[in-house]
Amino acid sequence: TDDARLVYRVIQEGQAAGGTAINYAKVVGLLRNKPGKVIGIQVRDVLTGAEKEIKAGLVINASGAWADELRGMIDKPARLRLLRGSHLIFSHERVPLDDAVSFLHAQDHRPVFAFSWEGATLVGTTDIDHDHPMSTDPWISEQEVDYLLSAVNHIFDCLHLTRDDVISTFAGIRSVLDTGKADPSKEARDEIL
């Protein structure tokens, strides 16, 4: 799935149904009526610093990994555990996969996958706690590179892949409900409304 394209499509559908989409805006506060019901948001244009109130009949917190920031604005406790998933990208010539494969990492028996993606081969993913500020883009750590290289070299031992074979990396943050499990991979991937 091209997640950027999916998000754009959801935005288009929302606009077609009468919604308004704004970009480069951060929610900095919630608007409330006298009884305390949330009736809108205060947003800041992150490019200009200008702020604006936007009123709404219904405010939905669909902010993913940032959801606890908004929950804090209504005095609700944090519920999320932020996990980073990182990936390595190899040239298709170096890792010539035409089909998707999934296997268990020899070290910890976590699932790892590899598949053809955008003319290259993608290998992932890690599953570690993300303890960095959400205001910065996530990045893959040296340990994650080693972890994924170890996995792919174990399964495709004839390739002898090194860091020099990695043409790109990327990482993303996924939020899961924090149940206090020691192993991030054991947290449930459930959604709640």
Residue ranges, per PLM feature:
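General beta-strand structural signal in soluble alpha/beta enzymes
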Residues: 21-23, 61, 123
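C-terminal catalytic lobe of FAD-dependent flavoproteins
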Residues: 3-9, 13, 69-73, 77-123, ...
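A generic structural motif
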Residues: 42-46
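A conserved short coil-to-beta-strand element within the FAD-binding core of flavoproteins
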Residues: 23-39
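Short, hydrophobic/aromatic-rich segments at coil-to-beta transitions
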Residues: 37-41, 98-99
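Core beta-strand elements of the Rossmann-like FAD/NAD(P) dinucleotide-binding domain
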Residues: 47-58, 62
